[in-house]
UniProtKB/Swiss-Prot annotation:
InterPro entries from the UniProt entry: Acyl-CoA_N-acyltransferase, Acyl_CoA_acyltransferase
Annotated protein name in UniProt: Acyl-CoA N-acyltransferase verG
EC number: 2.3.1.-
Pathway field: Secondary metabolite biosynthesis; terpenoid biosynthesis; Mycotoxin biosynthesis
Taxonomic superkingdom: Eukaryota
GO biological process: terpenoid biosynthetic process
Enzyme class name: transferase
GO terms of molecular function: transferase activity
PANTHER family cross-referenced by the UniProt entry: GLYCINE N-ACYLTRANSFERASE-LIKE PROTEIN
Record lineage: Eukaryota, Fungi, Dikarya, Ascomycota, Pezizomycotina
Transmembrane segments: none
Length: 433
């Protein structure tokens, strides 16, 4: 049976994804952000026709694809098997550990983490990592694999040629421009470094697709063994890289980061119940909350994830400031974090001299609360639906991905109330002719 891939309207597919929460949260959030900040090069695809609901009892697949995202995530894929058939062994919670925070989930290789593996006792103390799988029957798994391959084939046939043509024209324009000496090269940086020379993750091969937060069960369908391994991919599939071990995906109920009734909380003071240690505050001296544009260079200098300033300015974030008697006009935050374009808690960073003081948990809750608020980019106000249940559920879950060996960050997620329901990977996959 031939599998068809259909183009969908972003707003109209949201109710279907809301019904699959929390497992569908990454794709749902990415689509919501794309509605708030649209890109002409983005496409919403699914294995069922627009205007219809998926056939009951049959697996289906949906995705958001934007090849022009380049070195940032180009594709987010969700399969209904994630909600229906995810199987994951029990995960032992980690013991209390010092906050050593620079949580950034979108690494494409676990060795690219900000922490030096050889000096990290968390890594050396863990010998076995958890991997989530699908417990579905062989025929169902075979159908899901066929859907995944059909999606990749559709993207390669209908979208990749336009992207490659764009890259070729850009390279030609760059070559011509290079023949004319620039007035100044002070702002020019390598493709593999941030403006402050922090090594960045490598860009994917133009012929391949950078897929983010891919369920390890889906990745395993591309292996002949059906296991989470690189040893023997199925024909016509080349895996350029993937995370081994995978990331633990933590899910947070709204009651954990934004309870419905909190004493002393009001619309004017949405973070009043989130107690920071004495001497710290969620706003600068002028009362401004969040990460300001003048802080983005500092944020970029602390992470290897290539997030452009334009992207950072379009995602909800919060910052923590230190009380000081100084009147320095360039007051800078000492901790910050965001909800990424896919709604994940990302770039959660506490400066070294302020770690271990209990900042990460209230900061994380404040970030989630801001993004998932009714008027937030991922809240009910962003959904064009008359269905009250859809509007109620859309902001009910937040999530993040944390490396299994990063005990300090895992402990913070556990303190917030997060539960690991799946494991995921960032992978670069090429469909061969």
């Amino acid at each position: 049976m031939a599998i068809c891939i259909y183009e969908h309207d972003a707003a109209k597919i949201i109710p279907t994804l809301v019904s699959e929460l929390p497992y569908s949260t990454t794709l749902l959030r990415r689509i919501q952000h794309g509605i708030a900040y649209p890109y002409e090069t983005a496409h919403i695809l699914a294995t069922f026709p627009p205007g219809l609901t998926p056939e009951p009892g049959q697996p289906w697949l949906a995705a958001r694809v934007d090849l022009f995202a380049g070195r940032t995530t180009q594709m987010i894929i969700y399969s209904s098997l994630e909600a229906e058939h995810t199987s994951i062994p029990p995960i032992v919670t980690v013991s209390d550990s010092t906050e050593i925070l620079n949580v950034d989930s979108t690494s494409n290789n676990s060795k690219n983490n900000d922490t030096n593996d050889a000096d990290n006792p968390d890594i050396n103390s863990i010998t076995k990592f958890i991997v989530s799988t699908f417990s579905a029957s062989p025929p169902v798994l075979a159908l899901a694999r066929a859907q995944l391959l059909a999606l990749l084939e559709y993207v390669k046939t209908n979208m990749l040629p336009f992207y490659l043509s764009y890259l070729a024209k850009s390279a030609q324009a760059t070559s011509v421009a290079a023949e004319t000496p620039p007035v100044s090269t002070s702002s020019v940086t390598s493709n593999n470094t941030s403006p402050t020379s922090v090594p960045l993750i490598p860009a994917p091969d133009p012929q391949a697709f950078l897929i983010g937060s891919l369920h390890t069960g889906l990745f395993s369908l591309l292996q002949q063994s059906g296991s989470y391994t690189l040893s023997n991919p199925i024909p016509n599939i080349r895996v350029h890289r993937f995370d081994d071990p995978p990331y633990y995906k933590y899910f947070f109920r709204r009651s954990e980061f934004s309870p419905e009734a909190v004493c002393g909380r009001s619309a004017d003071l949405p973070f009043a119940d989130l107690s920071l240690p004495s001497g710290y505050r969620f706003h600068d001296r002028e009362g401004r909350e969040g990460v300001l544009s003048k802080h983005l260079d500092l944020v970029q200098s602390r992470t290897h994830i290539p997030r452009p300033r334009a992207q950072l300015s379009k995602i909800p974030g919060m910052a923590v400031y230190l009380d000081s008697t100084s009147s320095d006009a360039d007051e800078m935050p000492i901790a910050w974090g965001f909800l990424g374009v896919d709604g994940a808690l990302v770039t959660l960073h506490v400066e070294p001299e302020h770690r271990g003081r209990g900042l990460a948990v209230p900061l994380s809750k404040a970030i989630m609360r801001r993004g998932m608020a009714v008027d937030g980019v991922f809240g009910a106000g962003s959904v064009n639906s008359e269905d009250s249940q859809t509007r109620e559920r859309v902001g009910a879950w937040a999530h993040t991905e944390v490396a299994g060996y990063n005990n300090a960050s895992r402990r913070v997620m556990e303190k917030i109330g997060g539960q690991v329901l799946t494991t995921v990977t960032w992978t670069v996959i090429e469909l061969l002719d």
